[in-house]
Amino acid sequence: MAQITFLHIKTYEKKKKRLKALKKEIKKMANKPTNAEKFMNMLQMQFETDLLVMRKMQMLVPPSVDEYKFAIIDEIGELNHELKAKWCWWKESQEPVNQENLLMELVDVWHFCLSFTNNRTNFDVNELANSIAYDHLEEYTPIEFLNKFNRFAYGMPQMKETFEGLIGVGNKFGFTFDRVYEAYKKKNEENNARAKSNY
C-alpha cells in the first residue's frame, strides 16, 4: 500500500481548492444571462420607458419611422461630437475623448434602435435576439455605422445588421456588449426618472 505523504496531502488540498473554485465559477456562469437574454432584457426595459414617455406626452401612436430616423441620426451626431478630438483638424485646443461620455452617447443610439424594434417591426424579436453576433469582431466609426443605418428597415436582416453595427462601434472604442449592457441599464434608470419628472 502506497504511503500518503505530506506532498500527497498538499496536492490533494490544491485540487480540492481548485475544484471548489471551478464549482463556484460554474454556478456563477449558470446564473449569468446569455447575451440574447440581455438583449431581450434591454428591449423590455426600453418598452417600459417608451410607455412612460408616451403617457407623459399623451401620444396615442408611437413615433413615425422618420421620427425614429431623425432621433437616431441626431444621437449618432452627438456620438461623433464626443470624438471631435480625433477628427477636428482645424482647431488645436480640443478636449481629449472622454470614454465615459462616449459610452453614454453610444447607449443613447441603442435606446432609439431598441425603441424602433419594439414599436415598428413585425417579426419575432426572440429570433432577432438569438441571431445577433454579440461577439461580432468588426469595428465601425459612427460614419460607417450611419452608412449601414441608411439601409434601416422593418426586416429582421436589416435590424440584425443595425445592432451588429452598434456592437461594431462599441468594438472600435473598446466597449464590449457586456459593458454597453451595464451602461444601458444605468442610463435607462435615468431616462425613466426623467420621464416621470418634467424633462
Q: Which positions does each model-derived feature cover?
A:
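Flexible "arm" and connector segments at domain edges
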Residues: 3-199
